[in-house]
Amino acid sequence: MKDLSDTLFAEYLEGYKNLIAKVARIYCQDPEERRDLIQDIIVQLWKSFQNYDSTYAISTWTYRIALNVSISFLRKATTRKNTRDVYHQQVEWLHFQDTVIDENLEQLYQFIDLLKPIDKAIIILYLEGCSNKEIAEVMGMSVTNVSTKKQRIVEELKSYFKI
C-alpha cells in the first residue's frame, strides 16, 4: 500500500512541479532559499496527500498548500536577509546565467516581488487564468474581496509599466 501511495504522489508531483516552482519563484528570489522553499512545499504536500479532499480540484488544493507554505516561509524571513539584499543577489546571479531570460517576464517578476504576500498569491492565480471564484476558494476570501484586490493590483501593474 505504501508503494502505491509513493507512486501516486510521485506522479502527482511530476504533474504539478511547474506550479510549485512558479509559486516558489514569486515568493523567493534567492536560488538557495527557493530550493528550501520548494522542499518545504513538497514536504507539506506529502504530509497532506493522504487527506486530500476530492471536493476541491487538485490544482486548487496544490495552490492553497504552496501559497500557505510560501507565506509562512516569508514570515520567518526576519532571520534571513532583507528583500532588497536578496533581490540584488538575484540580479547578480542572473548575469552569470547561460540562458537569456525574457526581459518582460523578468520585469513582471520584479513588479510581483514588490507586492504583499497575499497580493502575490492573487496575481499568480490570476495570471494562471483562475476565475475570481477559484481565487477566492484558494485564498479563503470572498469573491468581492478578490475582485477588488485584483483590480487594484492590475491598476498598480499598469502604473508600474506606464500603460
Model-derived features: positions:
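A short, charge-rich alpha-helical start-of-domain segment used by transcription regulators
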Residues: M1-K22, I26, R35
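Short amphipathic alpha-helical boundary/capping segments
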Residues: E11, Q107-L115
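Residue-level preference for hydrophobic side chains embedded in well-ordered alpha helices
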Residues: Y12, Y16, I20, I41, ...
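Structural recognition of an alpha-helix C-terminal capping motif at a helix-to-coil junction
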Residues: K22, D36-V43, K47, Y56-N68
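DNA-recognition helix of helix-turn-helix
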Residues: L67, V138-I163
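Internal acidic/polar
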Residues: S72, R80-L105, S131-N132
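Helix-turn-helix DNA-binding module
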Residues: D113, P117-I118, E128-T148
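A short pre-motif secondary-structure segment
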Residues: I122-I123
